[in-house]
């Protein structure tokens, strides 16, 4: 009886260790996002060009990419030429999320006001896009990273594909490649465009609760990562 009393906790502990070990060894890129087939978190953020605030609601009715990027991100430089070529070739709208552009080291000499942060973030981003090309119809500034957190951003860059009804249908962690765009993104874009023409919703119970009784359409707020 005493042996059994100690054996059960030991077995449970070993099972827990095994599961933790498997989880730690898994590549985060291979872990599916729980946000797939759910409504993309809404937000309002200032645009890079200072045209006001942008909300994803402005793109309801369109299939589009949401790309998380930053000037300090080394992998973003690897990915960027691919996005520039893709934007010119395919015509799929890309909205960039400039993620945590202001780093802690920027405030070593003292805290910065929100206006100062926006000004510095815009200046850096404009210079970077001028040098490397601008694939975005617009970019928004997520200075504190809260929107990134709501989208489950694991690292930079990340890319999301959002359908005409504002649902996340695909997520890619890390730099996208021409192969990813050709073999994964574009086939899904074509599928979603066809799906939109039949006015069907993603088949999940949560989505059924969220789906409006009639399709909604919002014109982009602005003249159009």
Segments (PLM) and residue ranges:
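Conserved redox-active cysteine motifs that mediate thiol-disulfide chemistry
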Residues: 68-85, 99
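Short, internal strand/loop/helix patches
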Residues: 112-165
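N-terminal targeting signals for export/organelle localization
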Residues: 1-44, 199-225
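Loop/turn elements at helix/coil->beta-strand transitions in domains of secreted/extracellular proteins
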Residues: 61-63, 90-93, 135-137
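Hydrophobic beta-strand anchors of alpha/beta hydrolase catalytic cores
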Residues: 65-66, 94, 159
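Short pre-active-site segment immediately N-terminal to redox-active cysteine/selenocysteine motifs
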Residues: 62-64, 68-72, 101, 155
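Thiol-/selenol-based redox modules, centered on thioredoxin-like
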Residues: 161-225
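A short beta-strand-turn-helix
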Residues: 43-65
């Amino acid at each position: 009886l005493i042996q059994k009393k100690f054996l059960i906790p030991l077995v449970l502990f070993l099972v827990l260790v095994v599961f933790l070990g498997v989880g730690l060894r898994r590549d985060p890129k291979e872990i599916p996002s729980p946000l797939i087939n759910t409504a993309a978190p809404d937000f309002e953020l200032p645009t890079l060009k200072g045209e006001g605030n942008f909300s994803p609601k402005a793109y309801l009715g369109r299939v589009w990419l949401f790309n998380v990027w930053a000037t300090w991100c080394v992998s973003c430089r690897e990915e960027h030429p691919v996005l520039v070529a893709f934007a010119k070739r395919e015509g799929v709208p890309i909205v960039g999320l400039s993620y945590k552009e202001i780093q802690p080291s920027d405030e070593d000499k003292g805290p910065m006001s929100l206006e100062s942060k926006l000004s510095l973030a815009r200046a850096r981003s404009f210079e970077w896009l001028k040098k490397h090309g601008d694939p975005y119809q617009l970019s928004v500034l997520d200075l504190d990273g809260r929107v990134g957190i709501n989208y489950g951003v694991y690292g930079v860059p990340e890319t999301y594909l959002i359908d005409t009804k504002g649902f996340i249908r695909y997520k890619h962690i890390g730099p996208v490649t021409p192969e990813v765009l050709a073999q994964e993104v574009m086939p899904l874009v074509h599928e979603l465009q066809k799906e939109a023409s039949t006015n069907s919703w993603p088949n999940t119970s949560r989505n059924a609760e969220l789906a409006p009784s009639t399709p909604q359409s919002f014109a982009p707020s602005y003249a159009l990562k």
